[in-house]
Amino acid sequence: LIVGNKQNIYFEKYAKDFPKNQPQTIMSITKMFINLFVGELLNNKSINLDKKVSYYLPKIGSGYANAKVQDVLNMNVINAYTEDYTKAYSSSFLHEPVGGWRLPKSGDTHLSQESYLNTIKSKKNKNLKNKSNLAFYKSANTDVIGLIVEKISGKSLRHWMLRAVEAAGFEDGLYICLLYTSDAADELRS
C-alpha cells in the first residue's frame, strides 16, 4: 500500500510475504492501466463508449461484436468465453498460449492476441448484454479494450504503458506481459 501526492510518499507498507525488494506481478492491475488509457481517449473525444466493439474492431468475433464498449469495460458481457480455472476446458486455458504463459499444443498455430479474440463467439440464442447485476470477470474483456486503445491511437500498449510508468516516476523495473497485436509486435522489432 502506498499513499502519495505528486512526488511525496506519505505511507508505504508491504505484506509480510511480499517484501519491498521482491519482484511482484501486477496481473489485474493491468486492467486499471487500460481504464486510464480509455479515460485519456475519452477526454480527447477519441472514443465513444456507447459504440459497439465492432465499430472499432470490425473483425472481432460474435462474442464481442455487438457489445457496447462500456459493457466490456464494466465486465458486463455474456459470451462463450469462460474464465473458470476449476474447469479443465475453460476458454482461459486456450487463451494462455497467446501470451506465452503456456506452449501451444503440438501442431497448433500460435495465434496473435487479435486473432484469438476474433474467435470468441456469442452463446447460442443469447444476447451479449448481462442482465444479472453481477459482473462476469473475463481477462479477454480487458484484452479487447486494449486492442481498441491500440486501434484508435495507432500506438501499442507498450507505448501507453511506458508513458504511464514514466509519468508515475517508478524507480525500479516493472515487469508486465502485454499481448500485442501483430502491428504492435512489428513496432518492437524496429
Language-model-detected regions and their locations in the chain:
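Active-site helix/loop module of the DD-peptidase/beta-lactamase fold
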Residues: 43-85, 124, 140, 152-182
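Aromatic- and histidine-enriched alpha-helix N-cap/loop-to-helix transition segments
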Residues: 27-33, 64-67, 136-143
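Second-shell loop/turn segments in exported
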Residues: 20-24, 58-60, 128-135, 146-150
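Short, charged, amphipathic alpha-helices and their helix-cap/turn boundaries
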Residues: 9-11, 86-130, 155-174
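Single conserved hydrophobic/aromatic residue that forms the stacking wall/gate
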Residues: 180-190
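A short, well-structured edge-of-sheet supersecondary motif
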Residues: 1-18
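Flexible glycine/proline-enriched surface loops and loop-helix/loop-strand junctions
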Residues: 19-20, 124-131, 141-143, 178-179
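Active-site SXXK
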Residues: 7, 24-49, 72, 145-149
